[in-house]
Amino acid sequence: MVLATLPDTTWTPSVGLVVILCNLFAIALGRYAIQSRGKGPGLPIALPALFEGFGLPELLATTSFGHLLAAGVVSGLQYAGAL
């Protein structure tokens, strides 16, 4: 019954922008919220000093949260007709 009320969500560049913004927000939030950073493997690229101790587990955790957040934001914006 709930699925019948959700609008058809097709991918558009604006949906992609919302997902990117939600992921950036989640990474920024996770940067300060994760208390035990740097316990797992690091990223294979050089990062600025701002992200010191931000490794693969932290990246996977924050982007997973960002995608969950984006799913809710996109659904809400689609339902409101703003997207």
Swiss-Prot record:
Pfam family, one: PSI_PSAK
GO BP: photosynthesis
GO cellular component: photosystem I; plasma membrane-derived thylakoid membrane
InterPro entries xrefs: PSI_centre_PsaK_sf (IPR035982), PSI_PsaG/PsaK (IPR000549), PSI_PsaK (IPR017492), PSI_PsaK_bact (IPR037101)
Taxonomic superkingdom: Bacteria
Keyword annotations of the record: Membrane, Photosynthesis, Photosystem I, Thylakoid, Transmembrane, Transmembrane helix
Taxonomic lineage: Bacteria, Bacillati, Cyanobacteriota, Cyanophyceae, Acaryochloridales
Keyword Membrane found: yes
Principal subcellular localisation of the protein: membrane
Membrane topology per record: Multi-pass membrane protein
Locations listed in the record: Cellular thylakoid membrane
Transmembrane segments: 12-30, 68-83
Name of the protein described by the UniProt record: Photosystem I reaction center subunit PsaK
Name of the gene encoding the protein in the UniProt record: psaK
Residue numbers covered by the propeptide annotation in the UniProt entry: 1-4
Family: Belongs to the PsaG/PsaK family.
